[in-house]
Amino acid sequence: MNDISVFGSTGYIGSTFCRMYPDKITPVPREEKNFSTDQALYFISTTTNQSVFKDLHVDIDTNLSLFIDILSKCRDRDVIFNFISSGFVYGNDVLDYKEWYSCNPTGFYSITKRTAEQLLISYCKTFGIKYRILRIGNVYGFDKTVTPGKNVLGYMISLLKKNNPIKLFDGGNYLKDYMSVNDVCKAIDLVLEKGEVNEIYNIASGTSQSFRSIIMTARDILGSQSELIDVPMPEEQKYIQVKNMTLNIEKLKDLGFSCEMNLLEGLHKLCELY
C-alpha cells in the first residue's frame, strides 16, 4: 500500500494508528491542509455530543469547515480519501445496524459527522474522487484525557479505583460494543488495505453487553467497594445521549477481520493502567 497522509495524527486514535504503522504513514502537521500521497486518512474531529452546552460552533468549525478546506485539496487528483466517522451517525438507539441502514443523528457532534459524510460523498462523486467511510463504535484504551463525556469507561474505572460511587443513567441497562483502540487501528489498516472504495464500513468488535455489567465486571476485577447508583437520564441529555450502540460488522469480517483482545482482557488491562 502507498504511503498514507494522516490528518489528526496527534489525537487518541490517530496517534495510536501512527505508532502501530510508522512505515505506512506521513503525519500531516496541524496547520497544513495539503498532502502529496495517494491516500489520506482523516481523523480530525470533535468527540462528544456534549459541546452543545458550551460552544455551539466547535462541532461545525471542526467537523465541517476545516474538513471541507482539506477535502478541497483533493480536486483533480487521483487519491483515496479515507474518512473516520462514527457509529453515532445512526442515532441514539442503535442495535446491530448495518452500513446501509438509515441515519438519524440527534446531537451536534453526530449531526455534523453525518453531514460531513454526505458532503464527502457529494464532492467525491462530483469530481471523480475515491473515498471510504469508516464508522467507529465505542473505543476503549488508556487515555490521560478521560472525562464523563470522553472515554467514559476509563473515567468510570478511575472512580472505581478510588471506591467512589458510580452513577449510571437508567441503571446502565443499555447495550454497548466496546473495542480496544489497537483493534480499531488494526481494522482501519485492513480496510485501507483490502476495503472497496466508495463504500462504508462499520468498525466494532461485533459483541456487546450491558454497560452495567461491564462496570460490575471492572468493579470485581479491582475489588472495589464503589456503590452503583441508578439515576434517571437528565432531561437535557435524553435527546442527544446515545443509549444502545451495537454495529453489524459482516462487511468487516468479510475482509478477514477478527479482534485480538476481548473485552474481559481489555478490562483487566484498563484496571492496571488507570
Where are the predicted features?
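NAD(P)H-binding glycine-rich loop region in Rossmannoid oxidoreductase-like domains
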Residues: N34-T62, K73, F88-V89
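NAD(P)-dependent short-chain dehydrogenase/reductase
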Residues: I121-K176, V181-K186, L190, T217-R219
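N-terminal Rossmann NAD(P)H-binding glycine-rich loop of SDR-like oxidoreductase domains
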Residues: D3-P22
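Short acidic low-complexity segments
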Residues: I25-T37, I229, N262
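C-terminal substrate-binding subdomain of Rossmann-fold SDR/epimerase-dehydratase oxidoreductases
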Residues: K162-N164, F169-Y274
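Active-site helix of classical SDR
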Residues: T112-T115
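SDR active-site strand-loop-helix element
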Residues: F7, F43-T46, F81-G87, L134-I136
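Conserved Rossmann-fold NAD(P)-dependent oxidoreductase catalytic core, especially the SDR/UDP-sugar
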Residues: I68-F108
